[in-house]
C-alpha cells in the first residue's frame, strides 16, 4: 500500500489523502455470503433518534463474517482479499478443502494463495485461529473472544491487535491497545497476527461530502444552539456556558465514567490509560 496526496484541483481534493489497495478484489462479493442491509438512520422502533449523526450514505450490502472460526482441522486457501464497507479492516474469502467458503477478518500480511487453519492443532502462524491456551505467551493476536464459542469481540478494526502477556490456570492475561489488561478464559479463541489495513488512520477524507457517503451526518456544537436544544445554548453573541461541559441531556461529557458492568469488573486487571 502507498499513500496518495492529490493535486489541489479543488478544495476537496486539496486535503484528501488516500491509500492505494492494489491487492483487493475489484469485482462483486461472493453472493452466497451477502445479505441485504437496511439503514435505521439512528432511529429506534418508535422512529425517534437514539444515535445522533447518522443517516443517508451509499447503499451497502452486509458481508457475513465468520467470527467464530470453528471449522477445525481443515486447511483453507485465501482466494482473495476484499473491501468491506461495513468495517475498516479488509476481509478475506477462504475456500476450505471441502469446498465451503467463508469470509474472515484479514491479517496484516495475508495474501491470495495463503493457507490458514483453525483449531488446537493449527501451526503458530499469522492468520491461524487457536484457543489461547495453545498460543505462546507474548504473541500478538487479534479477533479475541470473551466467551468460548461466542465469536470474536476484541481487536477487530483496522490495524488493531492485542498481546497475550501471561497464562495462569484457566485464564490468560491480554493487554489491549488502550493499555487495559484483562483476564480471558484460556478456552477462548484468538487469531495470530494483527488486523489488515494498518494505514487506515493515515487517510483524510478532504471534504464533508466524503463523510456523508459513509452515512455520517454533521456534528453541531452545543454552544451554537438555542437553550431549548442544549444546556450550552443561548446568549447574545459568543458566550461561554459558565458550567462544565455537558451532553444535550445534562450529563458530564468529558472524563465522565459510563461503565456499568460490575459483573466483569474482577476480570479487568489494569484499567486503560487516561487520554490526553
Curated annotation (Swiss-Prot):
The keyword Ribosomal protein applies. Residues 224-265 are annotated as: Disordered. SUPFAM superfamilies: Nucleic acid-binding proteins (SSF50249), Translation proteins SH3-like domain (SSF50104). GO terms for cellular component: large ribosomal subunit. GO terms for molecular function: rRNA binding; structural constituent of ribosome; transferase activity. The keyword RNA-binding applies. Gene3D superfamilies: 2.30.30.30, Nucleic acid-binding proteins (2.40.50.140), Ribosomal protein L2, domain 3 (4.10.950.10). Keywords: Ribonucleoprotein, Ribosomal protein, RNA-binding, rRNA-binding. SMART domains: Ribosomal_L2 (SM01383), Ribosomal_L2_C (SM01382). InterPro entries: NA-bd_OB-fold, Rib_uL2_dom2, Ribosomal_uL2, Ribosomal_uL2_bac/org-type, Ribosomal_uL2_C, Ribosomal_uL2_CS, Ribosomal_uL2_dom3, Ribosomal_uL2_RNA-bd_dom. Coiled coil: none annotated. One of its GO terms (biological process) is cytoplasmic translation. PROSITE patterns: RIBOSOMAL_L2. It comes from the Bacteria. Belongs to the universal ribosomal protein uL2 family. HAMAP family: Ribosomal_uL2_B (MF_01320_B). PANTHER family: LARGE RIBOSOMAL SUBUNIT PROTEIN UL2M (PTHR13691:SF5), RIBOSOMAL PROTEIN L2 (PTHR13691). One of the primary rRNA binding proteins. Required for association of the 30S and 50S subunits to form the 70S ribosome, for tRNA binding and peptide bond formation. It has been suggested to have peptidyltransferase activity; this is somewhat controversial. Makes several contacts with the 16S rRNA in the 70S ribosome. Part of the 50S ribosomal subunit. Forms a bridge to the 30S subunit in the 70S ribosome. This is Large ribosomal subunit protein uL2. It comes from Dichelobacter nodosus (strain VCS1703A).
Amino acid at each position: 500500500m502507498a499513500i496518495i496526496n492529490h493535486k489541489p484541483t479543488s478544495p476537496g481534493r486539496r486535503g484528501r489523502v488516500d491509500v492505494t489497495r492494489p491487492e483487493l478484489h475489484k469485482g462483486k462479493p461472493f453472493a452466497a455470503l451477502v445479505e441485504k442491509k437496511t439503514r435505521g438512520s439512528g432511529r429506534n422502533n418508535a422512529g425517534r433518534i437514539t444515535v445522533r449523526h447518522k443517516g443517508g450514505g451509499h447503499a451497502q450490502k452486509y458481508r457475513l463474517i465468520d467470527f467464530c472460526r470453528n471449522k477445525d482441522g481443515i486447511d483453507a486457501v485465501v482466494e482473495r482479499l476484499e473491501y468491506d464497507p461495513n468495517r475498516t479492516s479488509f476481509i478475506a474469502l477462504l475456500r476450505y478443502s471441502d469446498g465451503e467458503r467463508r469470509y474472515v477478518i484479514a491479517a496484516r500480511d495475508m495474501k491470495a494463495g495463503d493457507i490458514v487453519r483453525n483449531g488446537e492443532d493449527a501451526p503458530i502462524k499469522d492468520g491461524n485461529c487457536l484457543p489461547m491456551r495453545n498460543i505462546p505467551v507474548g504473541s500478538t493476536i487479534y479477533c479475541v473472544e470473551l466467551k468460548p464459542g461466542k465469536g470474536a469481540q476484541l481487536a477487530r478494526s483496522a490495524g488493531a491487535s492485542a498481546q497475550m502477556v501471561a497464562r495462569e490456570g484457566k485464564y490468560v492475561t491480554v493487554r489491549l491497545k488502550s493499555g487495559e489488561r484483562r483476564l480471558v478464559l484460556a478456552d477462548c479463541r484468538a487469531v495470530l497476527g494483527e488486523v489488515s489495513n494498518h494505514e487506515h488512520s493515515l487517510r483524510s477524507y478532504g471534504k464533508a461530502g466524503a463523510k456523508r457517503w459513509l452515512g455520517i451526518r454533521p456534528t453541531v456544537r452545543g454552544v451554537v444552539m438555542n437553550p431549548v436544544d442544549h444546556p450550552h445554548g443561548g446568549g447574545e453573541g459568543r458566550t461561554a456556558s459558565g458550567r462544565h461541559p455537558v451532553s444535550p441531556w445534562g450529563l458530564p461529557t468529558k472524563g465522565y465514567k459510563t461503565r456499568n458492568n460490575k459483573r466483569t469488573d474482577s476480570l479487568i486487571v489494569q484499567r486503560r490509560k487516561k487520554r490526553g
